[in-house]
Swiss-Prot record:
GO terms for molecular function: adenine phosphoribosyltransferase activity. It catalyses: AMP + diphosphate = 5-phospho-alpha-D-ribose 1-diphosphate + adenine. The keyword Protease does not apply. Belongs to the purine/pyrimidine phosphoribosyltransferase family. GO terms for cellular component: cytosol. This is Adenine phosphoribosyltransferase. InterPro entries: Ade_phspho_trans (IPR005764), Adenine_PRTase (IPR050120), PRibTrfase_dom (IPR000836), PRTase-like (IPR029057). SUPFAM superfamilies: PRTase-like (SSF53271). It is found in: Cytoplasm. Keywords: Cytoplasm, Glycosyltransferase, Purine salvage, Transferase. Homodimer.
């Protein structure tokens, strides 16, 4: 193993170890992966931004899109490191300029996301960033918004993947390449 690969492996272990697991939250049977514990640790937070930025440094990305709210915490610093613009995708009524919206299904109901109509230009190569990939519904709606504006989603990046919930498989079927720093078993 090269020195660089060894450093990366150490960083990934440190990131994973910094994420606390809360049993039975928000309901019985769920193992909640709390990314805010990573944010409380500047070494782990910095490593996560560094690794994502390095991974996409030669990707040709022209915009980074972050989903409300924790996607902002990782997407904006990655955009800054890549030297490209950051675009927030938010809940309805939170963006001041003209928007388009996309609704999506939740376990018990629906939700809606919005994006400014002038934030993505036709031909933009977009990296979508969020903290956690579970079922993929939020990212799927985000991708639809970007594509409606003429952007090309190059990749979707996450700190945490929960593969058993099927989000990565769902997004891959739609031609979206996913990259996660760490994965956890369970829900």
């Amino acid at each position: 193993m090269t020195a660089s690969a060894s450093k990366t492996a150490q960083q990934l272990k440190y990131i994973k170890d910094s994420i606390k697991t809360i049993p039975d939250y928000p309901k019985a049977g769920i193992l909640f992966r709390d990314v805010t514990s990573l944010l409380e640790n500047p070494k782990a937070y910095s490593a996560s931004i560094e690794l994502l930025s390095e991974h996409y440094s030669e990707s040709g990305v022209t915009k980074v899109v972050g989903t409300e709210a924790r996607g902002f915490l990782f997407g904006a610093p990655v955009a800054l490191a890549l030297g490209v613009g950051f675009v927030p995708v938010r809940k309805p009524g939170k963006l001041p300029r003209e928007t388009i919206s996309e609704s999506y299904e939740l376990e018990y109901g629906t939700d809606t996301l919005e994006i400014h109509t002038d934030s993505i230009q036709p031909g933009d190569k977009v990296l979508v960033v969020d903290d956690l990939l579970a079922t993929g519904g939020t990212i799927e709606a985000t991708v639809k918004l970007i594509r409606r504006l003429g952007g090309e989603v190059v990749h979707a990046a996450f700190i945490i993947n929960l593969p058993e919930l099927g989000g990565e498989a769902r997004l891959t079927q739609q031609g979206i390449h996913c990259y996660s720093l760490v994965s956890f078993d369970g829900h």
